[in-house]
Swiss-Prot record:
Its EC number is 2.3.1.35, 2.3.1.1. It is an enzyme of class 2 (transferase). The record marks T137, G138 as: Involved in the stabilization of negative charge on the oxyanion by the formation of the oxyanion hole. The alpha and beta chains are autoproteolytically processed from a single precursor protein within the mitochondrion. It catalyses: N(2)-acetyl-L-ornithine + L-glutamate = N-acetyl-L-glutamate + L-ornithine; L-glutamate + acetyl-CoA = N-acetyl-L-glutamate + CoA + H(+). GO terms for molecular function: glutamate N-acetyltransferase activity; L-glutamate N-acetyltransferase activity. The active site is at T214 (nucleophile). One of its GO terms (cellular component) is mitochondrial matrix. This is Arginine biosynthesis bifunctional protein ArgJ, mitochondrial. Belongs to the ArgJ family. It holds the Pfam family ArgJ. Keywords: Acyltransferase, Amino-acid biosynthesis, Arginine biosynthesis, Autocatalytic cleavage, Mitochondrion, Multifunctional enzyme, Transferase. Catalyzes two activities which are involved in the cyclic version of arginine biosynthesis: the synthesis of acetylglutamate from glutamate and acetyl-CoA, and of ornithine by transacetylation between acetylornithine and glutamate.
């Protein structure tokens, strides 16, 4: 990542992020191996740029994936989505990822390169054809240095995979581009008398806007779950996590979120039938919370960001309307720059609410709308607007609330609908311009 023009204070802040958010250890699912190496995609000659994750359990795994909605879908997105669709999520065991080049808008050669990455990975791991999915991230419009990648895959698969914390960190680092720290989360949970484990990695710092953008994420579990149930759970979880974040309002060509389950920890199969309803609900809750934790790390690492902002919309007529309103605020450059400047300009919040494209005119009633800042120290909320009437705001307290890293804005629509949504974003700073102005240099 280029740091030209970024001051010493900002560099210290970025380093502090890494120390706070990169785990010193973790718990990892049974039956998976991961790793990352430098194969030559990145120009500096040393940064990790090739990652593999694979199922080593005796039985084949199941997978689900959610892909970008951008019309210019990158070659790896097209190839991987076809495999998931044709195999209905069954017998997908591995992921291969390169960073530094997106393999997007690269024509027929890009499609061939993406398929070749899968073919060589399957061969190196001893898996049947099309048992892997492929991801790429980086600069758009350049062909991959494919010979370097195809030479690197057997090297990585042949002796550089493992299940230690270091292996998982290497894998997380190998998918980064402008990220200032690798994003890795893991946890264990109890279900039906068994202990199951989740581990996840994500990449993203810029071009983050629903529905996903320059965002790669994958998480795996050793819980036993059917392909159809995993697909339903992933879509629910993604809608409330990776599709509920925004950094800069740009949507990428390469977004991919993948979940893989191998059942290595044993137990009864969890599916989406009535007999599994309770177990399905618990697993969905665990995966959704886990996905939110991983997605929030992407926002915390937003390019140039100094603030982590939670937007809570309450008492909406529907979850969909609550999310539309929250997204409208999160993508407002005026709102984001106000947060950077510790400016309690709630008029910008109302403006974004007012132009949001909600499904019904009844969803927003100016005379019932309430806006507040929720302090991170647990003290009483600072009311800015109550039932459409402005409050006399203590500007000093408002500035103090906005001066810390974690900020929450609460919007109570007062419709009585009871639906709510949380959405996460960051501020917009001078450093964002510097980073993106230097991206290809």
């Amino acid at each position: 990542m280029q740091l030209n023009g970024i001051g010493k204070h900002s560099i210290r802040f970025l380093s502090d992020k890494a120390s706070r958010f990169v785990p010193k250890g973790g718990v990892y699912p049974k039956g998976f191996m991961v790793g990352g190496i430098h194969c030559g995609v990145k120009k500096d000659g040393k940064s990790l740029d090739l990652a593999i994750l694979t199922n080593t359990h005796g039985k084949s795994a199941v997978a689900s994936a959610v892909f970008t909605t951008n019309k210019f879908k990158a070659a790896p997105v097209q190839v991987s989505s076809k495999i998931v669709k044709e195999k209905k999520g069954e017998e997908i065991n591995s992921l291969v990822v390169n960073s530094g080049n997106a393999n997007a808008v690269t024509g027929s050669q890009g499609m061939k390169d993406a398929q070749d990455m899968i073919t060589v990975t399957d061969s190196a791991l001893g898996n049947p054809t099309n048992s892997s999915l492929v991801m790429s991230t980086g600069v758009i419009g350049n062909n991959l240095p494919i010979s370097k990648i195809l030479s690197g895959i057997p090297q990585l698969a042949g002796g550089n995979l493992g299940n230690t914390h270091e292996d998982w960190l290497n894998c997380a680092q190998a998918i980064c581009t402008t990220d200032t720290f690798p994003k890795l989360v893991s946890k264990s949970f109890e279900l039906n008398g068994h202990t199951y484990t989740l581990a996840g990695l994500a990449k993203g710092a810029g071009m983050i806007c629903p529905n996903m953008a320059t965002l790669l994420g994958f998480f795996v579990t050793d819980a036993p779950v059917s392909a159809s149930a995993l697909d339903q759970i992933l879509k629910f979880a993604t809608d409330r996590s990776f599709n509920s974040i925004s950094v800069d309002g740009d949507m990428s060509t390469n977004d991919t979120i993948v979940a893989i389950a191998n059942g290595a920890a044993g137990g009864e199969l969890i599916d989406n039938t009535a007999s599994s309803a309770e177990s399905f609900g618990i697993l969905q809750r665990e995966i959704t919370g886990f996905a939110q934790q991983l997605a929030q790390l992407v926002v915390r690492d937003g390019e140039g960001a100094t603030k982590f902002i939670t937007i809570s919309v309450k008492n909406a007529l529907s979850y969909g309307d609550a999310k539309i309103i929250a997204s409208s605020i999160a993508n407002s450059s005026l709102f984001k720059t106000a947060m950077y400047g510790n400016d309690a300009n709630w008029g910008r919040i109302l403006c974004a609410i007012g132009y949001s494209q909600v499904s019904s005119g009844d969803s927003i009633n100016p005379a019932k709308t309430n806006v507040s800042f929720i302090p991170s120290d647990g003290s009483s909320k600072l009311k800015l607007l109550v039932n459409g009437e402005p409050e006399v705001v203590d500007e000093k307290r408002a500035s103090e609330i906005l001066s810390v890293e974690d900020i929450e804005v609460e919007i109570d629509l007062g419709t009585g609908g009871g639906q709510e949504c949380k959405f996460w974003t960051c501020d917009l700073t001078h450093e964002y311009i510097t980073i993106n102005g230097d991206y290809r240099s």
